[in-house]
Amino acid sequence: MTLTKETRVTLNDGNMMPILGLGTYASPHVPKSLAEEAVKIAIDVGYRHIDCAFITGNEMHIGNGIRSKISDGTVKREDIFYTGKLWCTYFSPEMVRKGLERSLRDVGMDYLDLFLMHWPVSLKPSGASDPSDKDKPFIYDNVDLCATWEALEARKDAGLVRSLGVSNFNRRQLERILNKPGLKYKPVCNQVECHVYLNQNKLHSYCKSKDIVLVTYSVLGSHRDRNWVDLSLPVLLDDPILNKVAAKYNRTSAEIAMRFILQKGIVVLAKSFTPARIKQNLGVFEFELKPEDMKSLESLDRNLHYGPFREVKQHPEYPFHDEY
């Protein structure tokens, strides 16, 4: 199948997700206003899939950007596929509605196209909420993931969410949701870190077998935010083999890294606040990697997580103790 910026994948609930989306995470020192401008530019050049999360603290700016492009007639609300995420401190069933409604209020929408459980680890709101919160410890909670899922299903029934999914779940955790007695809605996707150094082949194969779409963040090897990433790790885009393939196609290493994942049938979220790069990333639809180059890039896998969220490594639901 020829891939274009208009290509969408059909989710297991019948809704459609664009195969390329704009990631909007920004490290704390980056002005939140840049996210708003990035969204406007992305929509102008053809992006229709915008991914955000409560924990990034910029949903209000993302919403401003989307609404401005609706107001000027560039798009209609139904043209946009917007993803939000329920943070780990909102996993108690009685907190799920509050977490969702806060995102709806911040982004200024009546509904979200997709709402994800951000990580499979429940945290108590009285402790730290993310790794940049240095003044508090993380306080683990023991909320049953299935109980959170049931509360999310109720929000879908209420019309506040079109599709439900998960993020950073391993196979065992996915199976727990899928095997839940009385399950009403399967997760439509699992959003995970995935790139040439972490190709996620086993998890991808499992998800496909269950009609769950794999979506990738950090496709370019992640931002270099020391709150989340070990800065001693190699810079993915400097990889010699990746750059050799890029030279062969007269493309950037970023374009090759994204095209590799897209050709594997995985939805890609490309994060950038730089106008030129936002436009350049659409170049992934202008070429196709040959089988021998796909094979060469497959060989780069080293099971490397740039963002393993080690701060919760002792949590009983920490996902990366399992193989996949």
Swiss-Prot record:
Q: Tell me the keywords, alphabetical order.
A: Acetylation, Eye lens protein
Instruction: Return the PROSITE patterns for the record.
Output: ALDOKETO_REDUCTASE_1 (PS00798), ALDOKETO_REDUCTASE_2 (PS00062), ALDOKETO_REDUCTASE_3 (PS00063)
Q: From which domain of life does this come?
A: Eukaryota
**Which residues are annotated with the PTM N-acetylthreonine?**
2
Question: According to the UniProt entry, where is the signal peptide?
Answer: none
Q: In which residues is NADP(+) bound? A: 218-281
Q: Does the keyword S-adenosyl-L-methionine apply?
A: no
Does Ion transport appear among the keywords? no
InterPro entries tied to this protein = AKR, AKR1C, Aldo/ket_reductase_CS, NADP_OxRdtase_dom, NADP_OxRdtase_dom_sf
Q: Name one Pfam family in it.
A: Aldo_ket_red
GO MF terms listed in the record are: oxidoreductase activity; structural constituent of eye lens
**Cited PANTHER family:** ALDO/KETO REDUCTASE
Share what the entry says about its subunit structure, partners included: Monomer.
Family to which the UniProt record says this protein belongs = Belongs to the aldo/keto reductase family.
Report what the protein is called. Rho crystallin
